[in-house]
Design a protein with these regions (language model features):
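Conserved C-terminal alpha-helix-loop-beta "cap" of PLP-dependent enzymes
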Residues: 11, 15-85
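Ligand-binding pocket scaffold of soluble enzyme catalytic domains
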Residues: 7
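Short, surface-exposed loop/turn motifs that are enriched in glycine and acidic residues
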Residues: 1-3
Length: 87
């Protein structure tokens, strides 16, 4: 049950990334998602959210890793999705 919840939260993030037009560096069906963001978007989001810089894609884009867990709430994901939509 716990594993299903974290993957479901990650899939919500995945859909938000794709809706924003961010490609996926790695196509993952797990609780880890790897969108490719502009460096500017990385700079904005890193002030409020924890994620890992995965790899520089080019001078203007960076692949990052978002990871959900058993403790990731709907509110956590809702807040990130809302902030993504504002970018």
């Amino acid at each position: 049950e716990i594993g299903r919840q974290e993957v479901a939260q990650a899939m919500r993030l995945r859909e938000a990334f794709l809706a924003k037009g961010w490609p996926l560096f790695v196509d993952s069906s797990s609780n880890q998602q790897f969108p490719v963001l502009t460096n500017g978007d990385v700079a904005v989001l890193r002030h409020k959210y924890s994620f890992e810089v995965w790899e520089k894609v080019d001078q203007a884009h960076t692949a990052v890793r978002f990871c959900t867990s058993w403790s990731t709430t709907d509110g956590d994901v809702d807040a990130l999705i809302a902030d993504i939509q504002k970018l």
